[in-house]
């Protein structure tokens, strides 16, 4: 804060334990990865409830996976919803919030005129495995 440096708090797998303190600080929070076993001491209390608890406390939450190749974000958002996170908070946690956290929200993260048109259109709930992808657009062009 003293030097005005942008800061994002990463991982926060046990952030639910200090949600009120984190909400006071107003730092962007990147929560995850939540998949896997709690083999490290600092993972003993990780839970899919963490993103929802932090969002309800007023935190600006992104869901992260540490999986650079396989796009697990929708699945992680679905697990967070199942654990009590609001669906719109979960959607924001994998779209506009991460874009804001890394400073590219002027181009991506939401549907607005002038932004990149990277869109997935789903028949059904996008966070439910029964949802069917109908269209994918990258830069406004449909891809097969």
Where are these regions (language model features)?
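His/Asp/Glu-enriched, well-ordered alpha-helical/loop segment
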Residues: 2, 20-122
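Composition- and surface-driven signal marking solvent-exposed, interaction-prone regions
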Residues: 1, 9-13, 132-135
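Functionally constrained cores in energy, signaling, and assembly domains
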Residues: 8-11, 93, 101, 142
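Catalytic beta/alpha-barrel core
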Residues: 6-15, 34, 38-40
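Charged/polar interaction segments and conserved charged motifs
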Residues: 14, 19-21, 138
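C-terminal cap of metal-dependent C-N hydrolases
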Residues: 100, 112-144
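Glycine-/small-residue-rich active-site loops that bind phosphorylated ligands and cofactors
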Residues: 14, 68-69, 128
């Amino acid at each position: 804060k003293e030097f005005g440096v942008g800061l994002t708090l990463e991982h926060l797998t046990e952030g639910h334990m200090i949600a009120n303190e984190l909400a006071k600080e107003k730092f962007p929070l990147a929560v995850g990865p939540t998949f896997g076993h709690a083999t490290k001491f600092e993972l003993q209390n990780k839970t899919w409830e963490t993103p929802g608890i932090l969002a309800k406390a007023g935190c600006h939450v992104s869901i992260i996976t540490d999986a650079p190749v396989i796009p697990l974000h929708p699945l992680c958002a679905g697990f967070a919803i199942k654990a009590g996170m609001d669906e719109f908070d979960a959607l924001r946690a994998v779209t506009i919030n991460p874009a804001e956290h890394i400073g590219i929200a002027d181009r991506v993260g939401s549907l607005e005129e002038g932004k990149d048109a990277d869109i997935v259109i789903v028949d059904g709930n996008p966070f439910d495995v029964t949802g069917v992808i109908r269209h994918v657009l990258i830069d406004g062009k449909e891809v097969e």
